[in-house]
Amino acid sequence: MEETQQNDQKMEFRALCEEFRANNQIPPEKFDLYQVKRGLRNPDGTGVMAGLTLICNVHGYLIDDAERIPDKGILTYRGINVEDIVEGCRRENRFGFEEVAWLLLFGKQPTRSQLEGFSKLLNSCRELPEYFAEDMIIKAPSRNIMNKLGRSVLALYSYDDNPDDPFLENNMRQAIQLIARLPTIMTYA
């Protein structure tokens, strides 16, 4: 495409954006009137509670006299500081991937026997569907690895013989297969 045509397109896109802005802006006072949070933030910048979970927590600030004060960030999985998990893995010279996956799924650290069985199960589920790596990852490159991971996860739906079954056993199978396959997908991505 020649430069003049590209410039014309840019100008047309800008004009369309202005038209869009003129007819799609919600006045800020409406958010206050209807108590709607923008971007999952309160007016003071603190996060909005969007749900309850036992899986993880992120601590990044304190509230003192209605003022948000930054604090050392702490990420916990199932009540365990992630820094402690990492330190334990370093100290014992282990990877920790399977152990953390178990912790996130089942709410407690696995016994040695549970971890061995879980690792074997993950190993048996690591293989990607035939031609998946070539067709979905290698032939469709992306500069953004998160985009590549997202696309790959969505594409796996097409290879699942029972993708919409809502029961726990099926959801567990899907979760285990995703956990097992993501490291393989990342290496191709």
Language model features: what each stretch is:
Residues 2-189:
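Hydrophobic alpha-helical bundle cores within soluble ligand-binding/oligomerization subdomains
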